[in-house]
């Protein structure tokens, strides 16, 4: 019973981490006040204003996170016990897509 509670706890922590990661990463990756202004004197003046995309790079962050957790969690599970090692890949196959879908739906619901 204790191993199943541990598995459930780890799964909940994993899913919550993925669901709340877009909010944290968007704040870290893009500064909303970033602007680039340039002037050219060849034929006149030209201004260039750049805008930061708050969702830039999130796919690669989630990919790296999934790969790292995919390597680390089964190794830890094998040390905890063979029952957990059998159940964990099934949980990860279901939890990761579910968490990604939840994150996408959360991004769509946020006002821009």
UniProtKB/Swiss-Prot annotation:
Keywords: Allergen, Antibiotic, Antimicrobial, Cytolysis, Fungicide, Hemolysis, Secreted, Signal. GO terms for cellular component: extracellular space. Residues 27-56 form a propeptide. It comes from the Eukaryota. GO terms for biological process: defense response to fungus; defense response to Gram-negative bacterium; defense response to Gram-positive bacterium; hemolysis in another organism; symbiont-mediated cytolysis of host cell. Residues 93-106 are annotated as: IgE-binding determinant. It is found in: Secreted. Expressed by the venom gland. Pfam families: Pilosulin. Residues 57-78 are annotated as: Critical for cytotoxic activity. Its main location: secreted. Transmembrane segments: none annotated. Has strong cytotoxic and hemolytic activities. Is more potent against mononuclear leukocytes than against granulocytes. The synthesized peptide 57-76 shows a potent and broad spectrum antimicrobial activity against both Gram-positive and Gram-negative bacteria, and also against the fungus C.albicans. Adopts an alpha-helical structure. This is M-myrmeciitoxin-Mp1. The lineage of its organism: Eukaryota, Metazoa, Ecdysozoa, Arthropoda, Hexapoda.
